[in-house]
From Swiss-Prot:
Basic and acidic residues: bias regions: 99-110
The encoding gene: rpsI
Claim: Ribosomal protein is one of the keywords in the record: yes
Name the UniProt record assigns to this protein: Small ribosomal subunit protein uS9
Family named by the database record: Belongs to the universal ribosomal protein uS9 family.
């Protein structure tokens, strides 16, 4: 493990992703599985690869990810956030374009808590006039 590697932590909803960028040929491994087997949907794979495609570093780094918590969309967003942070650590000149695309900003939207007297966060029990 004497190779140069760049670390980045990404978060989205309840998901946390620990990302390592290692010089390589663009292979993405998530929880020791290929990206194609981990994410069935093409849209999620596109979300994960967005920062690499935007900066033109897709073929320069192998991406090793450890992600837990949340669902598929949250995990994809967390991985994108982690990759972006690691890319900025590798090359500070990439910061402006990644910031402009909004990848450096942690998405603050979280699940709203359930309130008592209601069925869900905002869903009220059915109203009966009589």
């Amino acid at each position: 493990m004497a190779k140069v590697q760049y670390m980045g932590t990404g978060r989205r909803k309840k998901s946390v992703a620990r990302v390592r960028l290692v010089p390589g040929n663009g292979k993405v491994t998530i929880n020791k599985r290929e990206i194609e087997t981990f994410f069935g949907l093409e849209t999620l794979r596109v979300i994960v690869n967005q920062p690499l495609v935007l900066t033109g570093t897709k073929d320069k780094f192998d991406v090793l990810v450890n992600v837990h918590g949340g669902g598929f969309t949250g995990q994809a967003g967390a991985i994108r956030h982690g990759i972006t942070r690691a890319l900025v650590k590798s090359d500070e000149t990439l910061r402006p374009e990644l910031k402009k695309a909004g990848f450096l900003t942690r998405d603050p939207r979280m699940k709203e808590r359930k309130k008592y007297g209601l069925k869900k966060a905002r869903r009220a029990p059915q109203f009966s006039k009589r």
